[in-house]
Curated annotation (Swiss-Prot):
Chain ranges passing through the membrane: 66-86
Covalent S-S links between cysteines: none
The protein's name: Uncharacterized protein B117L
Protein family membership: Belongs to the asfivirus B117L family.
Residues of this chain annotated as glycosylated in UniProt: 29, 60
Topology term for the membrane: Single-pass membrane protein
Keywords attached to this entry: Glycoprotein, Host membrane, Membrane, Transmembrane, Transmembrane helix, Virion
Species: African swine fever virus (isolate Tick/South Africa/Pretoriuskop Pr4/1996)
Length: 112
């Protein structure tokens, strides 16, 4: 099946069937027995092909869902970086506290 891609009035891409494209299944000769069987095969083939391409018929370039998905990913990355920063701060705080306690313990041992 032939398709042309064009922009509609809203600036969105549209897929239209190309009328200049000649499908061998649709070129059936009425006098030939094989052409009749080809024509019988053409309808389900075209229907299945059209149904398969249905989700990709129109691409909306101004769709806000793309930006919503991008925003969600950016928020997840921001939270991940925030958690890494908090974990590093907590680790440094624990390390400094333990170091301070060990130093205080050693100082108290030296005083005895």
């Amino acid at each position: 099946m032939g398709y042309t891609i064009q922009l509609d009035k809203d600036g969105d891409y549209c897929w239209d069937e190309d009328p200049t494209h000649h499908d061998p299944y649709t070129q059936a000769n009425a006098t030939s027995h094989t052409a009749v069987s080809r024509a019988a095969m053409a309808a389900p083939h075209a229907a299945a092909h059209h149904a398969f391409h249905e989700p990709f018929i129109k691409l909306n370039l101004t769709d806000k869902n793309i930006f919503n998905g991008l925003g969600f990913i950016l928020i997840v990355i921001f939270i991940y970086l925030l958690l890494i920063t908090l974990q590093q701060m907590l680790t440094r705080h624990i390390y400094n506290t333990v170091q301070h306690c060990v130093k205080a313990h050693l100082d108290s041992k030296n005083l005895q």
